[in-house]
Amino acid sequence: LMTMGQDPALANIQALPNIELRLFNPWKQRNLGARAGEMIAEMERLNSRMHDKLIIVDGRATVLGGRNIGDHYFGLNENYNFHDLDVLAIGALAADANGMFDEFWNSEWLASAEQLTTEPDPEKARQGWVRLQLRNRDARELESFPVDPKNWGSEWAMLEPALRPGTGYLVYDDVASGEIGQGMLGTMFAFFEQAQEELLITNAYIIPGEPGMDMLQRLGERGVDIRILTNSLASHDVPAVNSHYEPWRQRIIQTGTHLYEMRADAEIQSIVDVPPVSGKFVGLHTKAAVADGRYVFIGSMNLDPRSAAINTEMGAIIDSPMLAADLRDVMLRDMSGENAWQVTLDDRSHLQWTNADETVTSQPKRGFLQSIMNVVFKVVPREQF
């Protein structure tokens, strides 16, 4: 569904030197008219989406996390940008990443872009690349980025001291089996339930369902200190998710969980936006957790039905007290009153939102239209989000 109408652009990307492109779960019909029938007949299949995010360099290093490739994820959009998180790994995790990539690349879910009916035009692709380079030279939003090749020696010098020792492994949905979206939820719950003292979760889209509530209840009864940060309606880019998250707020808090929601005007916007860009608000896109100050999860998986049963997802589980300490500091900063609302219950068990400046008794929002959309999307089955 995400590549509707993009055949010419995809064909021209494929035509560029040294680039090979494959599409996950593509349309079988290339004609727009025929796709209407395909959508009716195969909507369940077409709704399956590859949500994994992975970069591998020379088979030796990998970057993975929640970040897509787009302006919103790199602080370059004038409307809003995302606070997101990745991890750079060298060693065994990079080897795992190579294996995962090969499984996807060779799976029956992928098709080569060469199968597109639009014929690639190498000259048109080259001209488009030249135009893009010329546009980028003058693009206001790219002022902070070098146009010409740069020596990155100083950046590499800062990188090495920031690396943390640890052991880890990759977890991901098994596309080789022909089934997707069936394994990661159990993996995530097992990670959470290993916590004995403290569990910090930052996740952009949360719809816990009864299984998630049961897990939080069990952890709470064991005395685990649980803190969860997710989006507020005001910081949300997908109000439909908020529509199906909000009925769970009270029950989440009643398990003893400390619940926080991102402020749309969070102070961390200053490190999210890349000057001179200044978005109108900041949203949360991170998917991460720290258990007992030692174990770390960073990946692509949201805690909602779509990630649990429809998307393919992935992540890294890492045993590293030093990395966990770094990430814990970041997560607690993001949960502070300057960056988030703490959602609590008052004496009458009514919800209230408190930040560093004020307490309010209705969920923060950016405007009346958000409130309308929040109501409208309640009629859409939560399993789609």
Per-segment meaning from a language model:
Residues 1-53, 57-385:
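Charged, low-complexity intrinsically disordered terminal segments
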